[in-house]
Regions:
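Hydrophobic helix-and-loop "lid/oligomerization" segment in the mid-to-C-terminal part
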Residues: 1-69
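Secreted, periplasmic, or luminal enzymes acting at the cell surface/secretory milieu
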Residues: 57-168
Length: 168
């Protein structure tokens, strides 16, 4: 039904992400993927309509090997009851989506420095990467990512010209 509707539409708005079992306090996720049924639907919708916008509901990083299917992605974190209205305000241009990512969106979990020793059998979290936690690791090691820490767009463009610098 969704694929048929996508074929007949100008644009597809696809809301997806992690469910309440994946987004809970007090436990670690075993992987960084969204549910497989959502991945399958992304692939089928993309065949039906290439003009797709993805609206992600997730409180943490997810792998996105399918992100190329979307013309735009809007990460909404955990929206709450007013989330749909906020998304509508952004997509309609009423407000500027000026937020920036607070985490690095990696290509795959295996690219993280903790991959080889997680999960740990210890009771404490291990940060063997020292000061190179998060974006510092990816920047320093030159590991390609999907979207870096601080990434984000807004509805505007900037252009500089006729710049002048006065020497001191």
């Amino acid at each position: 039904e969704a694929v048929d509707l996508a074929r007949r539409s100008d644009v597809v708005l696809f809301f997806f992400g992690l469910n309440e079992k994946s987004e809970t306090e007090g436990l670690d996720r075993k992987h960084l993927r969204i549910p497989q049924n959502q991945i399958n639907l992304i692939q089928e919708l993309a065949k039906a309509n290439a003009n797709m916008i993805g609206i992600i509901s997730a409180g943490s990083v997810i792998e996105m090997p399918w992100h190329h299917h979307f013309k735009a992605l809007l990460h909404t974190a955990l929206m709450g009851q007013a989330g749909a209205g906020a998304v509508l305000d952004i997509l309609s241009g009423k407000v500027n989506p000026s937020g920036k990512l607070a985490e690095t969106y990696i290509k795959k979990y295996e690219d993280t420095p903790s991959y080889n020793y997680y999960p740990s059998q210890e009771r404490n979290s291990e940060y063997r990467e020292g000061i190179y936690v998060g974006y510092r690791y990816f920047d320093t090691a030159g590991v390609p990512v999907n979207y870096p820490f601080g990434y984000g767009l807004s509805y505007t463009t900037f252009e500089y010209d006729n710049l002048q610098v006065k020497p001191d």
